[in-house]
């Protein structure tokens, strides 16, 4: 806002001294408390000069609300955050406004932190929480527990397991993991340096050296986690797989290797530091206010009792929610954020601020604004944060998770984790202070935590340490149950169009997290089931060209920080720009998703779309539906809205819904002779198979040679897509349950969209084995369908209870599939058509080809890692579909494959004498270069002259030196020269003292530079750490500036290289 008619006044504050500014006005060990105290002297706004830069601090709700206006202010990275960039560069937390990598990473990672995905992480969170309970239970009632340290262990292990599938096992260590020690020291140093003048920092050489060591250690650890995932891939829908494999839905770009590491460290730090502080402060306040502890424990007893805590319990713990909110009000563990004006501006009607000048809301002061929270604002009273009071708070009066689009992306993750931990601890223990005279001391880095706070924990009467083995672990000991034969007769039902009468429906969604997209796909399937003709299911931004008067438009949308999803922004802007009634004749309905903790923007965008469509002439055919992710399941809410509101509004009668319900399949099946499977995949024959690693190796790798089908060709460096089969044990369970023989043949006809093979005879074993997922957890709708097919009332009622009250604990938490439930409830006479319709399609997997096509004509080889781990469902083990299928194949077996082309530049030269090649690989990255070298050997044998070729190969040691005998033969023949590095045995003669491949490249830099100057192409294949290190050493060698005094110009030179001269591919 501007104030042309008001007198501007200077922003108050203490006088700054030359050079040191206001450094001596702050206690560098308690800078936040120093700032909070200054508000008492200077009022709600003051300024300081810190580290040579003027900064403005605000401490009330009115000014905070003003600077949170993203049309006038944006986040700026300054002071401590700017120093953090030395470690994490432009990661999500430290990126400057407008940095491209932030936009890409944010769009890629938003789906990972959607409400459905967070709920799916509950079991892993509970795994770590139970480890904490077991540790405290074994301490006994007199042991002083270092609360902050153990909560740090807990939150670090939780974010690592949930986001990256990595176990720190912190509760089994005497000391913290080295990553934590490095991180804590780096954060403390950074916090101290942020308050010192640049001159002082420039002289603090010891801290600079220590910072570099800490950064190196943190990035190396993160790289190891990435390398482990790449060497042992898992089919997990987690943050690490998103970083490695997902692309930006807007630009199609993926993350660079460096950006992957930046964001991994960001999440490991931010994902546990603030939550551990929250938990520590919460227990401090509860113990200092025993009436609140008693009330919280009573709520846990009433809601959960002695049962295992489930995700559905959490939304019912209203008082625990209030405790966490009130704790973050008084002790916001991320105590401030920084914004800057987009242009010169005025705040508070009288204080001038310059463009980009740092403005810091100090949340401990803002959250104690007596104008909002009353005269007792500094007192801890959870009752003020119960649902009704919390949602009446003014905008931006509670900001512990930051602001707007740069707010905490992991808020829902942290909240679910904190609620779970408090609940299980209160369920298991009674607590006392170790020292009742303890007064709160705060330890500051970039976050705050209690310092020196200790407690004692006594097991409650209903708890024992023996009983603390998590239910999920106990269930892993159960033997896998197999289904028994059920109804052996499958009747083909008549095709029913339904009362949709073929009316056209278009469905659109606005979704960053992926939840609304999933809901839209479910809605499309249901529309087809009831006789509607689904024209499209697409993002809202595609809707402008698809609004016609002869169809029904259904919209599923959510709100992100008060704004539309990224793929709905253009649509909303278009809708706002319309005038008059240009949408007259369009029929529509809107279903909105939200979370009530974002009270000021709850359902904002769905409501806006609903109202604007009506204002512009469209006809609302059904009242808007709504799902609150904080208290319910989105998919169940959509089903309720469909059945109670949407279908009746569209003229579907209860009789039709009953007749075409979930037990009535839309498929017609008849049995005929066997027929060939999917046409895009052809049969290849296994000619040899071997395991490359020993049984002691943590990562089992295999090698397979395949005879390709006729006319299937590939080029050296290409990929092979494999169509896998489900494990035979699961296929047999399904066949047995429906009393079907392996060679039974069926034909599928569908009245709606399906990815199943239709109008084609297919073996039922092929269908169950190669087309559908048999282990996907059942949904409430699936279970209701089973209930409808039950032949006795007790079974029906038991299944209906599973679909409702017991769904989370007995189905979702145990990840029971439809097949599992059919095995448990033998009286369910479900038609095979209905079962097949419930299953999701099975996808192919892709592998690098590690051979040259001419080496063994019509053959190709592949390499892969075997996935065999404990199943989440408790039904035996989880077997990777493709990896175990391939492992089970013997020479002569058939597998269906299809060639996929690689990067056009990632191929050896057709004329081997045209230019030299330099190949650089680590570990399994050797695979494509094995094909390169085979091709050169054949060219040499044909009498062709070979330009020089170098292979730099890094691995652990001689025992890990893949294809060693073969490579020795190639080297003796002059096809290639191999130069090795052994990370675990650098003193071996072959390694020439080099532990890492970049060291070996540098040691051979003279020959490397000579070949480069002769026009060599450099090929790199390996992990991100290796690829980055090779790029750095390559620039030093090829650019000719070993000191890298002009790093920017050398990087510019690298960026301008012919993309065919330096080709790098990350190995997965």
UniProtKB/Swiss-Prot annotation:
One term of GO molecular function: heme binding
Cofactor requirements of the protein: FAD; FMN; heme
Residues the entry annotates as binding heme: 408
EC number of this enzyme: 1.14.14.1, 1.14.14.130, 1.6.2.4
Coiled coil: none
Regions of compositional bias (Polar residues) in chain numbering: 472-498
Domain Flavodoxin-like: 505-646
Protein name: Self-sufficient cytochrome P450 monooxygenase CYP505U2
CDD domains associated with the record: bifunctional_CYPOR (cd06206), CYP120A1 (cd11068)
Span of domain FAD-binding FR-type: 679-909
Positions of the UniProt region annotated as Disordered: 464-498
Pfam families per record: FAD_binding_1, Flavodoxin_1, NAD_binding_1, p450
Domain of life: Eukaryota
Residue sites binding FMN per the record: 511-515, 590-622
UniProt keywords, alphabetically: Electron transport, FAD, Flavoprotein, FMN, Heme, Iron, Metal-binding, Monooxygenase, NADP, Oxidoreductase, Transport
InterPro entries in the record: Bifunctional_P450_P450_red (IPR023206), CysJ-like_FAD-binding (IPR003097), Cyt_P450 (IPR001128), Cyt_P450_CS (IPR017972), Cyt_P450_E_grp-I (IPR002401), Cyt_P450_sf (IPR036396), FAD-bd_FR_type (IPR017927), Flavodoxin/NO_synth (IPR008254)
SUPFAM superfamilies (UniProt xref): Cytochrome P450, Ferredoxin reductase-like, C-terminal NADP-linked domain, Flavoproteins, Riboflavin synthase domain-like
Record note on cofactor: Binds 1 FAD. Binds 1 FMN.
Keyword Transport: yes
Catalytic activity entry: 2 oxidized [cytochrome P450] + NADPH = 2 reduced [cytochrome P450] + NADP(+) + H(+); an organic molecule + reduced [NADPH--hemoprotein reductase] + O2 = an alcohol + oxidized [NADPH--hemoprotein reductase] + H2O + H(+); dodecanoate + reduced [NADPH--hemoprotein reductase] + O2 = 3-hydroxydodecanoate + oxidized [NADPH--hemoprotein reductase] + H2O + H(+); dodecanoate + reduced [NADPH--hemoprotein reductase] + O2 = 7-hydroxydodecanoate + oxidized [NADPH--hemoprotein reductase] + H2O + H(+)
Family: In the N-terminal section; belongs to the cytochrome P450 family.
GO cellular component annotations of the record: cytosol
Function: Self-sufficient cytochrome P450 monooxygenase that catalyzes the regioselective in-chain hydroxylation of alkanes, fatty alcohols, and fatty acids. Preferentially hydroxylates 1-dodecanol at C3 and C4 (positions omega-8 and omega-9). It is very likely that CYP505U2 prefers dodecanol, and probably other fatty alcohols, over fatty acids as substrates. Does not show any significant activity toward tetradecanoic acid.
